Amino acid sequence: MQYPEPIAKLIEGFMRLPGIGPKTASRLAFFVLEMKEDDVLDFAKALVNVKRKLTYCSVCHNITDTDPCRICEDSKRDESVICVVQDAKDVIAMEKMKEYHGKYHVLHGAISPMDGIGPEDIKIPELIKRLQDDTIQEVIVATNPTIEGEATAMYISRLVKPTGIKVTRIAHGLPVGGDLEYADEVTLSKAMEGRREL
């Protein structure tokens, strides 16, 4: 059956989201059709605001609605420690455990030669520039425990070690092949406690 164009376009839009296939997209589109108009308008406004009002912090590259972000601006945080993560979602996961009080650096990816992603394609040059600040004493590498995450961790370690800054890696309380954003607070907390020097 051919859907009316507005529904077909909405289904198409939902299918652009990761993990959403044609059946789920269709269910979502028909759910939206049944929503109250005010709720649909609020939802549409939220989608537009995400694109218009959010940016990346010029210091740590986390998502933010202020620049620098609130974490970078927080004078109560430990400026001597930087936790390096792959994605902005990982910062949210780390913050949920409420045990890490340092700063962050978001790479926006991992080194993956198979996908043509090298160190210059992610925020590694920006990290090295940040490390020229004499206050930094430790870099915690919290990339995902995947082949790409491990390759990125080793690359960062080789770059940072000669500077005399301590480089540690979070412990693998996290499943190999898993993503930080899906880990619970206890698992993340144990992984941070068991971090090791690289």
UniProtKB/Swiss-Prot annotation:
The answer to keyword Phosphoprotein applying to this record is: no
Zn-finger segments (C4-type): 57-72
Per the record, the similarity remark reads: Belongs to the RecR family.
The UniProt entry, under InterPro entries, shows: DNA_Rcmb_RecR (IPR000093), Rcmb_RecR (IPR023627), Rcmb_RecR_Znf (IPR015967), TOPRIM_dom (IPR006171), TOPRIM_RecR (IPR034137)
Q: What is the lineage of its organism?
A: Bacteria, Bacillati, Bacillota, Bacilli, Bacillales
Please name the GO terms that the record assigns under molecular function.
DNA binding; zinc ion binding
For this UniProt record, give its keywords in alphabetical order, as a comma-separated list.
DNA damage, DNA recombination, DNA repair, Metal-binding, Zinc, Zinc-finger
State the protein's name. Answer: Recombination protein RecR
Q: Which domain of life is it from?
A: Bacteria
Q: Tell me the SMART domains matching this sequence.
A: TOPRIM
The record's function comment reads: May play a role in DNA repair. It seems to be involved in an RecBC-independent recombinational process of DNA repair. It may act with RecF and RecO.
Please cite one Gene Ontology biological process associated with this protein: DNA repair
Q: Which residues form the Toprim domain?
A: 80-175
* Xref: PANTHER family: RECOMBINATION PROTEIN RECR
